[in-house]
Curated annotation (Swiss-Prot):
One record GO biological process: aerobic respiration
SUPFAM superfamilies on file: HydA/Nqo6-like
Family that this chain belongs to: Belongs to the complex I 20 kDa subunit family.
Entry note: cofactor: Binds 1 [4Fe-4S] cluster.
Catalysed reaction, written as an equation: a quinone + NADH + 5 H(+)(in) = a quinol + NAD(+) + 4 H(+)(out)
Highest classification ranks of the organism: Bacteria, Bacillati, Bacillota, Bacilli, Bacillales
Any Pfam family hit: Oxidored_q6
Name of the encoding gene: nuoB
Predominant cellular place of this UniProt entry's protein: membrane
Protein name per its UniProtKB record: NADH-quinone oxidoreductase subunit B
Subunit-structure text: NDH-1 is composed of 14 different subunits. Subunits NuoB, C, D, E, F, and G constitute the peripheral sector of the complex.
HAMAP family with a match to the protein in the record: NDH1_NuoB
Keyword Cell membrane recorded: yes
Amino acid sequence: MDVKWEGFSGVEMEEVKRNVFLTTLEQLKGWARSSSLWPLTFGLACCAIEMMAVGGAHYDLDRFGSFFRASPRQADVMIVSGTVTKKMAPLLRRLYDQMPEPKWVIAMGSCATAGGPYVKSYSVVKGVDQIVPVDVYIPGCPPNPAALIYGIHKLKEKIRLEAKTGKKVL
């Protein structure tokens, strides 16, 4: 797409071409959404301690534009960390349903991902993906805070790619 500019010299026109970015509104919205994720914490076990460390001074999740929210109505990402029991499942689903669209879920740790060491217990859900759709899985028992930050960055990439292609990315 060539844009005709009146009154620019050749050097000035090259400068304009290097500094003007063209995008779609959907890509711009995807970039904005991925740059300001507001997670809702659903910490249930030892993984929650590692999740709390991400908000501390050493890792400082705020510098990436993510601010922990206490209300599901203000959040767009749910971080489930720890063992989810069958009695807790309806509450988890209710919180997910209260979040506004678009919304994403991160399963942090082996307990949230597949039941962890309690997988053979009658009361443990064998993965949070049986209750809510999960976008990013973070392995580990417990995963360190750097792994959670990496998972959040992977979610940001996924959001941008979905906005760019217009298709759901698995």
